[in-house]
Swiss-Prot record:
The avian keratins (F-ker, S-ker, C-ker and B-ker) are a complex mixture of very similar polypeptides. It comes from the Eukaryota. This is Feather keratin. One of its GO terms (cellular component) is intermediate filament. Belongs to the avian keratin family. The modification N-acetylalanine is found at A1. One of its GO terms (molecular function) is structural constituent of cytoskeleton. Keywords: Acetylation, Keratin. It comes from Chroicocephalus novaehollandiae (Silver gull). The keyword DNA-binding does not apply.
Length: 98
């Protein structure tokens, strides 16, 4: 009969010449729409460096001052000309890099 001619759920074929109604119940459809991935780029820390060594006056006066502090055992942290401006730590035996 006509039930065998029922096509899949969807539009009815135009060539169906059967006089009996063709009824077929299809299952409910479920469509899952997933959002696309969103990439957010946050700026990282901005690192900048500035030279810390500054010299005022001549190098002789600076070195004399450092030796005076070193002879008294006073810690000295300064710019100076040594080790990229890191200064030194003066102990009883001399000036050591930090």
């Amino acid at each position: 009969a006509c039930n065998d001619l029922c096509g899949p759920c969807g539009p009815t074929p135009l060539a169906n010449s059967c006089n009996e109604p063709c009824v077929r119940q299809c299952e409910a459809s479920r469509v899952v729409i997933q959002p696309s991935t969103v990439v957010v780029t946050l700026p990282g820390p901005i690192l900048s460096s500035f030279p810390q060594s500054t010299a005022v006056g001549g190098s002789a006066s600076s070195s004399v001052g450092n030796e005076l502090l070193a002879s008294q055992g006073v810690p000295y942290f300064g710019g100076g000309f040594g080790l990229g401006g890191l200064g030194c730590f003066s102990g009883r035996r001399g000036c050591y890099p930090c």
